[in-house]
Amino acid sequence: MGRSGALRVWSLGMSVQLFLPLVLCITCIHGLSPPQPRVLLSFQELQKTPSFEHYTLSEKAMDYRILFMDEDQDRMYVGCKDHVLSMDINNISQNTLKIFWPASTSKVEECQMAGKDPTHGCGNFLRVIQPYNRTHLFICGSGAYSPVCGYVNRGRRPEEQVFQISSRAESGKGRCSFNPQVNTVSVMLNQELFSGMYIDFMGTDAAIFRSLTTRNAVRTDQHNSKWLSEPVFIDAHLIPDGSDPNDAKLYFFLRERLTDSSGNTKNIHTMVARVCPNDTGGQRSLVNKWTTFLKARMVCSVLEEDGTETHFDELENVFLLETDHPKGLLIFGVFTSTSSVFRGSAVCVYNMADILTVFNGPFAHREGPNFQWVAFQGRIPYPRPGTCPGGAFTPHIQSTKEFPDDVVTFARNHPIMFNPIYPVGRKPLVVRTHADYKYTSIAVDQVTAADGHYQVLFLGTDKGTVQKVVVLPSNGSLDEDLILEELEVFKKQSPITNLRISSKKQQLYVSSEHGVSQVSLHRCDAYGSACADCCLARDPYCAWDGLSCSRFYLTGKRRSRRQDIMHGNPLTQCRGFNLKAYRNAVEMTQYGVKNNTTFLECQPKSPQASVKWLIQRDNDRRKEVKLSDRVVSTNHGLLIRSVHSSDQGLYYCLATENGFKRTLAKIRLQVLSEALVSALSNKQQSPWSWAAALHPKALVSAFSPAETLAMHQYCKERKQMQSLQNIQSPMRGDLGKLKPLLDHRKSRNRRNHLREE
């Protein structure tokens, strides 16, 4: 099959040939081992910082979801099992308002009798929180497999501290899924609710539904696999299309199981569907059904030089980054692949202009003996299917009921676009393979640094951590991405369910089944206390101000601010800021015993640094330490399993990061013989006398001058350490009273001791 043919098949994902390129590409990207974060902070370490807050109702898992954030009123609304929460986005651990809204006892009993999970199914799990008007929210929950909805009065101003249900519960069917484990996505427009969910108890009837309306309810064509095929709804957004508000469309991001051309195999693919909010259905056909429904496939793949593609087909989360122009809107998607052959995650970004081009392109059509998908070549009726009534292109048509019959018929039979939507540059921003985690959610911030604009990605994982990633452009097939930090934002490991970002507050909000956490977008001091550390971090939020690594502001007034995100070169940015200190580490002395194990500790602050060990013997030139089964370099230092006399010397621990080299440790290893150590350790029980064999005169004659010198040095250092400990921890009680007596007896027996150094 030619390249064009391959693209034709992949555009709809209808070919079993997808498996072959996947297998071929595994070896291509096998070498892309996941990078390490420069800073890793545990939950306990985060709790000690002022930039972290955490909230939970219980130690039990309650499936928290951040469902709506209102930055104008500084409130964030969270749904979980049997509760609705209103949080202060300045500090989520303070002034949190709660509503207890459980499912009725009878519904819980019916749910359990139906065999549903009593813990994760038979409760009222909040899945919809939407602003209804200035004072009220519209909320829906699963209601123990019997969806319920209601209205919450939140007051006009947050200082009123009003938060209570103001109406009786009403049916949530067509507004919220029965099963809380099945996603529900929703958007409220002009007091009309648009939802993507499953409409029945069994979870077989999926629909994009408009409810809560004075007009007729509208939904997708029921049990029509061309429209929806076992969808998993991910998110929904209203996106403008030009200056006319009537042309704006609702986009639903989802993944589906689509049947291939043979009709036997179902492959998972990511799709984006759209409808016009003012669609009221057809007059004779598609009555109370969308007449403007269209969908297209979103591709996130790695294209190799031989033309094969490795696909990440399962969409997990999306984030919309607004720009100055509606068509310049960027859509970030987190994708995974969980096949038995290959497992990984990727982040792809799409331009809204490219999405509009696909929806304005050819429609998909089946023809030929094998019902192969091809581009429709016939006449397309007017107005073009998918066009909104009353918009810039159809000002004379005020309702979809006025559409000609051929338009409605065509829309029913051709809901799929032929061309797929490719990411910017036809490549992912981030790829993770062979990692022990996968990405689940994303939030993005546009940051202005001294050398340009950067997109900082906050990526939630299924391990309960959040990674901060900056992507740097490169000339290769993939951009270079740096994990600036990884944060354990929850005490217990569980997948991140939501991320919400506030650029205004410079805060990130994270939810999982165990609670909600709030963390600052930047912790510049965590990178280190020196200019080189700050520069090597390459964090767009941070810069060296001459004294510390601190928040960067593009004011142009402080020339001493040092920042280099693109290159991260301390040699050019940190001149005059004590770079020599990195080349001249303090020399330490360490003793090893011949034929025993010793460990030279050296751990770079950054896991992104590579370490090399050098040794200098007797003022000779420094040489690289030869590693073997006996001498092993670890993440924490150099392990010598069996010390030889030839191991004695001055060891240098050199770290290299982004081309910048520095000496982290200088350790002088003194090798002691086993006989010497045995002599030092085999004193009699009495502290005032020596055994005959260990008399000082016998010791002096037993060892070489070098060993005697090493012994004196060892004893001197031990005495200095003990003196320091005595100063820090003075003796108390009976031992303190006994010390003068011991000193007196010691002076009387001084002739029996080695002269103190």
Which stretches of residues belong to each language-model region?
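Proline-enriched interdomain boundary motifs that mark the N-terminal boundary
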Residues: 577-586
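Type I single-pass or GPI-anchored cell-surface glycoprotein architecture
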Residues: 546, 551-575, 656-659, 675-757
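Immunoglobulin-superfamily Ig-like beta-sandwich domains in protein ectodomains
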Residues: 478-486, 610-639, 646, 742-749
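Extracellular beta-strand/loop-rich beta-sandwich domains predominantly from IgSF
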Residues: 446, 588-592, 627-650, 655-659
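Disulfide-stabilized extracellular ectodomains of secreted/luminal proteins, especially beta-rich
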Residues: 2, 6-501, 505, 510-518, ...
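Conserved Ig-like domain signature around the intradomain disulfide
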Residues: 530, 598-600, 609-611, 646-656
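Extracellular/luminal immunoglobulin-like beta-sandwich modules
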Residues: 522, 612-614, 650-675, 726-729
